Regions:
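Regulatory nucleotide-sensing modules
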Residues: 1-19
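Cyclic-nucleotide recognition modules
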Residues: 35-93
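Polybasic "coupling" helices that flank or enter modular domains
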Residues: 64, 82-150
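Phosphate-/nucleic-acid-contacting segments
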Residues: 123-184
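Short beta-strand segments in beta-sandwich/barrel cores
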Residues: 3, 21-26, 44, 68-69
Length: 184
């Protein structure tokens, strides 16, 4: 589809996807893992990266279907935030929600099962828990990321496949509902 922004581009505008379906792609760990998600609208591209130490997009975004966007430059966002309390409150809520998500994901740092470790990696890379996850990664690389052997990761992925939680292809994992992956 049509590229909106690329991973690493400067985030100097609020970009609202008003209609259509947008895909995000994140490459991490020296491109050893690539996570693709689809998002329904309305959707705002990484508003938390408009300010702060890292003002670059974490993902690449492209339109999966025809749609429309609204782009508001940062200087206009600044003026709107100075003028309207509701804009300031919304930006504060977005930032706090992002921070709470990161804190909650890292709270239970010690995990026991391989499935929990896979869940943590996928959640850490995901922008939302709502959409299906398409993960391109070699089993050896995933094993290295979670500190497990390739054999143990293979067994767990096959178990997830047999339970209907994940679809496994060579170098690819598809998880339709990330909440199914989480251990109780």
């Amino acid at each position: 589809g049509t590229r909106i922004v690329s991973q690493g581009d400067k985030c100097n505008s609020l970009i609202y996807i008003i209609s259509g379906i947008v895909c995000s792609t994140l490459s991490a760990h020296d491109n050893k893992i690539v996570l693709t998600e689809t998002h329904d609208t309305p959707f705002v591209l990484e508003p938390y990266n408009l300010y702060g130490m890292n003002q670059n997009y974490e993902c690449s975004y492209s339109m999966h279907t025809n749609g429309s966007t609204l782009v508001i430059k940062k200087n206009i966002v600044n003026l709107l935030m100075m003028k309207y309390q509701i804009i300031r409150t919304n930006m504060l809520n977005i930032t706090c929600s992002r921070l709470q998500r990161v804190v909650n994901e890292n709270r239970d740092f010690i995990t026991q099962s391989i499935r929990e470790k896979i869940f943590r990696v996928v959640c850490a890379l995901s922008s939302t828990k709502k959409s299906p996850k398409h993960i391109k990664v070699k089993m050896e690389d995933l094993a290295d990321m979670i500190g497990e052997t390739r054999l143990n990761v293979s067994k767990e992925l096959n178990s997830m496949k047999n339970e209907g939680i994940a679809k496994i292809k060579r170098g690819e994992i598809i998880i339709d509902n990330i909440n199914d992956l989480k251990c109780k």
